[in-house]
């Protein structure tokens, strides 16, 4: 269900409700960090995703696992929210809700999400340079980087911000040269 329109339609009101709660308590960033942690855990564990999505597993078992897994590591408002999702049988949409919450948080804080694909891991200096360029291009106050490694790029980076793609990879440059040469002959 990841990324489906149906999932987004259900997740959005829950994410907005969580954002309203977080704003009223001035804990938007804290909840955002907790949502990132939850997304990381879900990304790492297919078993957990299957467990919380299973209609066969009892709600009390889901609550128990979530409490043991997340314990006091997340804000108690978010923990209560997760228990509500279990009770309402909406925990299956947890990933979409967290992603939607983070999108709302980025909008609130004038932050853009940039997906950067590079041939190798970026150094701290390269990360700063990419962030500075993205800020200049978008006018955003801050940038959240999501990095991916693709050795096939040979060198350089591909940066995706929203629907815009900036291809500064060696593979992209070679492709553009090839197109211009075949078009010129």
UniProtKB/Swiss-Prot annotation:
Transmembrane segments: none
Pfam families according to UniProt: OSCP
Keywords from the UniProt entry: ATP synthesis, CF(1), Hydrogen ion transport, Ion transport, Membrane, Thylakoid, Transport
Listed InterPro entries: ATP_synth_OSCP/delta_N_sf (IPR026015), ATPase_OSCP/d_CS (IPR020781), ATPase_OSCP/dsu (IPR000711)
Topology term for the membrane: Peripheral membrane protein
GO cellular component: plasma membrane-derived thylakoid membrane; proton-transporting ATP synthase complex
Gene3D superfamilies: N-terminal domain of the delta subunit of the F1F0-ATP synthase
Gene Ontology molecular function: proton-transporting ATP synthase activity, rotational mechanism
Main location: membrane
Compartment list: Cellular thylakoid membrane
Summary of subunit composition and partner proteins: F-type ATPases have 2 components, F(1) - the catalytic core - and F(0) - the membrane proton channel. F(1) has five subunits: alpha(3), beta(3), gamma(1), delta(1), epsilon(1). CF(0) has four main subunits: a(1), b(1), b'(1) and c(10-14). The alpha and beta chains form an alternating ring which encloses part of the gamma chain. F(1) is attached to F(0) by a central stalk formed by the gamma and epsilon chains, while a peripheral stalk is formed by the delta, b and b' chains.
Role: F(1)F(0) ATP synthase produces ATP from ADP in the presence of a proton or sodium gradient. F-type ATPases consist of two structural domains, F(1) containing the extramembraneous catalytic core and F(0) containing the membrane proton channel, linked together by a central stalk and a peripheral stalk. During catalysis, ATP synthesis in the catalytic domain of F(1) is coupled via a rotary mechanism of the central stalk subunits to proton translocation.
Family statement: Belongs to the ATPase delta chain family.
Protein's UniProt name: ATP synthase subunit delta
Organism: Crocosphaera subtropica (strain ATCC 51142 / BH68)
Gene (name only): atpH
